[in-house]
Amino acid sequence: MSKELIQVPMTTLDFFQYTQEGLTYYEFNATECSPPEPMVNTMHGLNLIKSQNDRLVGIFFHEPTPLYAKLGSRFSYDAQELESGDFRITFKLT
């Protein structure tokens, strides 16, 4: 799998796109950021999700629970704690 750097308007982090098992992933790493940068980048990154086959993956230094309330009913998420203590959150359309 190769990850391609993509431009996402109004973001401050690098976003990468890749395909795996028929799904398109858009990924960013917010572990070096401080609030509100991770939330702002996530909210703009969610605009990339156009179909049931798209996923947005964010890597965070803690679980971003305040962010979940901002998702509304359009998106769902899966949170996975990594061995490093960081969190991998995968967002998709509901």
Regions found by a protein language model. Give the residues of each.
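Short acidic beta-strand-loop surface patches of small beta-rich interaction domains
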Residues: 63-66
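Long, charged, low-complexity intrinsically disordered regions
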Residues: 1-33, 40, 47, 51, ...
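Short, glycine-/small-residue-enriched flexible loop/hinge segments at domain edges that mediate gating
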Residues: 29-32, 55-61
